[in-house]
Amino acid sequence: MGLLILGLGNPGLEFSLTRHNVGFSLLDKIVSKNGLFLKRKKKYEYSELKMISGRVILVKPLTYMNLSGSLFPSIFSDFYMCIKNLLVVLDNVDLPLGKCRLKERGGVSTHNGLRSISSVLGSSNYSRLYIGVGSNLMRDIKSFVLSRFCKDEMDRLEKLYDFLSDELIDISEANFKNKVQKINSSNF
């Protein structure tokens, strides 16, 4: 089995290290931790790991998050993958900072990146990893997800990214349920 990990975020330095870009940040951690580098295609950057369980393709879209679906279906054919190989990594304001939720499939809720992907694929039958970015009821949601983390929050997230970078690269169909339990019970 192969795995295509799609980290959601917005391109550009102004969005770097914002709450909305935790998908990008996690993929950057996996890339650096494994001594890889990102290559550039027309609509995305990618890197590839070869694991015992199969290839792991890491993808960062060069489109804005709300247009993430525009990568499909061509990205599947570029890497000989299909929807069952897809794992989308994204932010979630309903989870506390440092908490994760790995799901085999689910709805699109209010996340525009998921909505875009599901609309193009005609299905929401793919895995996703939600990374909690906390919430601030005093600010509007758009301003909040586009805000940067403070130093204490970044320190916690770095520990989480380190943990997740080890856990995600060897996910397979055989161990998915165990990974769900381990990742979902973690808290950083």
Swiss-Prot record:
The keyword RNA-binding applies. It is found in: Cytoplasm. TRNA binds at F15, Y64, N66, N112. Its EC number is 3.1.1.29. The active site is at H20. Keywords: Cytoplasm, Hydrolase, RNA-binding, tRNA-binding. GO terms for molecular function: peptidyl-tRNA hydrolase activity; tRNA binding. The record marks N10 as: Discriminates between blocked and unblocked aminoacyl-tRNA. Its main location: cytoplasm. The keyword S-adenosyl-L-methionine does not apply. InterPro entries: Pept_tRNA_hydro, Pept_tRNA_hydro_CS, Pept_tRNA_hydro_sf. One of its GO terms (biological process) is protein quality control for misfolded or incompletely synthesized proteins. GO terms for cellular component: cytoplasm. It catalyses: an N-acyl-L-alpha-aminoacyl-tRNA + H2O = an N-acyl-L-amino acid + a tRNA + H(+). The record marks D91 as: Stabilizes the basic form of H active site to accept a proton. HAMAP family: Pept_tRNA_hydro_bact. PANTHER family: PEPTIDYL-TRNA HYDROLASE (PTHR17224:SF1). Monomer. Hydrolyzes ribosome-free peptidyl-tRNAs (with 1 or more amino acids incorporated), which drop off the ribosome during protein synthesis, or as a result of ribosome stalling. Catalyzes the release of premature peptidyl moieties from peptidyl-tRNA molecules trapped in stalled 50S ribosomal subunits, and thus maintains levels of free tRNAs and 50S ribosomes. Belongs to the PTH family. This is Peptidyl-tRNA hydrolase. It comes from Borreliella burgdorferi (strain ATCC 35210 / DSM 4680 / CIP 102532 / B31) (Borrelia burgdorferi). The lineage of its organism: Bacteria, Pseudomonadati, Spirochaetota, Spirochaetia, Spirochaetales. The gene is pth.
